[in-house]
Amino acid sequence: MPPINIVILIPARLNSSRLPNKMLADIEGAPLIVRTWQQAQQSSLTRQVVIATDSEEIAGVMKACGADVVMTSPDARCGTERIAEAAENIDADVFVNLQGDEPLIDPGNIDLVIKPFLQENPPDCSTLVYRLLAEDYAALHDPNIVKVVMDSQSNALYFSRSPLPYQRETYAATRCFRHIGIYAFRAGVLRMFSEHGPSMLEEAESLEQLRLVENGYSIRCVETDVDMPGVNTHEDLELVRRLYRSRRS
């Protein structure tokens, strides 16, 4: 295949409902969004990392670090709509959607989600999944942990906050997967995302990836064995701070 241009887009907003201003929360001397950007910079397959935000405060912090920033509308209904707007004036073949609250993202996972686009017959979109084991029973029933089921070609059939698949008699954990919210999109697919508008299942589950599923786009799921915590709550933030301190000690 000919070389392709790949750009990482990081959506970032201040008005998080569960942890306000989390993007600027300090993690060992740097804001959370800066830590995520630093990890993204280590990807070996991308040529640019861009912050997409509607916050002048976030924009100022990131520009001071030397990051590329695109200002977006405050009306975006989800992170993918925000990066779709940012992508309108960026020349790339593939865009990676990396959530801004992932300061411990493994750069290898970023490269892993890109790899389906370096092969023949690339999908419309790709994402990562992590296998749930027997001791992860609680995770299967946690609505804050998104589960996914796939077909025989590892394409997503459905995502849900409910247990997937439902176990009628036994807990077959070896075939249960949690979804990791990083995506790569063909440029044309990303640009069509906002045009479709929120779908019925997307609104029911509050999962933006279901907009793609309902509209017939393929989402290739790539399994990873590295799953680091994101930051959605104050408890998550304290855990990430402890992990950063342990790395430095």
Swiss-Prot record:
What protein family does this chain belong to? Belongs to the KdsB family.
The lineage is:
Bacteria, Pseudomonadati, Chlorobiota, Chlorobiia, Chlorobiales
Could you tell me which pathway this protein works in?
Answer: Nucleotide-sugar biosynthesis; CMP-3-deoxy-D-manno-octulosonate biosynthesis; CMP-3-deoxy-D-manno-octulosonate from 3-deoxy-D-manno-octulosonate and CTP: step 1/1; Bacterial outer membrane biogenesis; lipopolysaccharide biosynthesis
Keywords of this entry: Cytoplasm, Lipopolysaccharide biosynthesis, Nucleotidyltransferase, Transferase
What HAMAP family does the database record attribute to this sequence? Answer: KdsB
GO biological process assignments: CMP-keto-3-deoxy-D-manno-octulosonic acid biosynthetic process; lipopolysaccharide biosynthetic process
The superkingdom of the source organism is Bacteria
Which CDD domains does the record cross-reference, listed alphabetically?
CMP-KDO-Synthetase
Q: Could you tell me what this protein is called?
A: 3-deoxy-manno-octulosonate cytidylyltransferase
